Amino acid sequence: MDTAMQLKTSIGLITCRMNTQNNQIETILVQKRYSLAFSEFIHCHYSINANQGHLIKMFNNMTINERLLVKTLDFDRMWYHIWIETPVYELYHKKYQKFRKNWLLPDNGKKLISLINQAKGSGTLLWEIPKGKPKEDESDLTCAIREFEEETGITREYYQILPEFKKSMSYFDGKTEYKHIYFLAMLCKSLEEPNMNLSLQYENRIAEISKISWQNMEAVRFISKRQSLNLEPIIGPAFNFIKNYLRYKH
């Protein structure tokens, strides 16, 4: 049996501003439209021969609505929930055939529904720093800038990269190691107005994002307590760096 550890790397940009109304540093966070567990299941990133506890844990980490969607056994609806109208027909066909082989052909989905019924609690939709996977031959910083614009609509001329800051964090989930690398940027004054409504201006730019907003450190701590991904160890040092940067700048 293949036990090799997989490494998945994402690169992100922590972009900050000083909110002049309350004199607090804020950063842009985006909320995913679906849970990581739901995405992993739909893309068949699991072993059908794994112990049932691993599969039940995957369903535990889905939202209630996602579990209900899987129980319909309607793969088209599940796929649409992630990809919407994105044309990825070859990938769809490959994943559908695997879903059909794993769950529909053996017993018409009875085992799958039984496993879902054993799930307890409910997962949450993650708030995270805008990030994504690097393209082939793409530098880390270029990837961070590209992904940030794709997820927020804010282009390169509106912020300044602070090259002295670069942090990474890793965590493990079964056979997969997830590594996130982050750069830091400071927003230019032309976009620092506290009333700038990112939720309305950039919402639904891409299929995977449902919300986008400015968050201060108190909000980051609150969010981190309610989800599996703890943002405080990365955003905390970034905010401290920004404080020192602003102190010496002025």
Swiss-Prot record:
It holds the Pfam family NUDIX. Mg(2+) binds at E138, E151, D173. Keywords: Early protein, Eukaryotic host gene expression shutoff by virus, Host endoplasmic reticulum, Host gene expression shutoff by virus, Host-virus interaction, Hydrolase, Late protein, Magnesium, Manganese, Metal-binding, Multifunctional enzyme, RNA-binding. Signal peptide: none annotated. Its main location: host cell. The keyword Amino-acid biosynthesis does not apply. Decapping enzyme required for the removal of the 5'-end m7GpppN cap tethered to viral and host mRNAs to allow their decay in cells. May therefore accelerate viral and cellular mRNA turnover to eliminate competing host mRNAs and allow stage-specific synthesis of viral proteins. Acceleration of the turnover of cellular transcripts may even promote the shutoff of host protein synthesis. In addition to the mRNA cap, g5R also efficiently hydrolyzes diphosphoinositol polyphosphates. This is mRNA-decapping protein g5R. It comes from African swine fever virus (isolate Tick/South Africa/Pretoriuskop Pr4/1996) (ASFV). The lineage of its organism: Viruses, Varidnaviria, Bamfordvirae, Nucleocytoviricota, Pokkesviricetes.
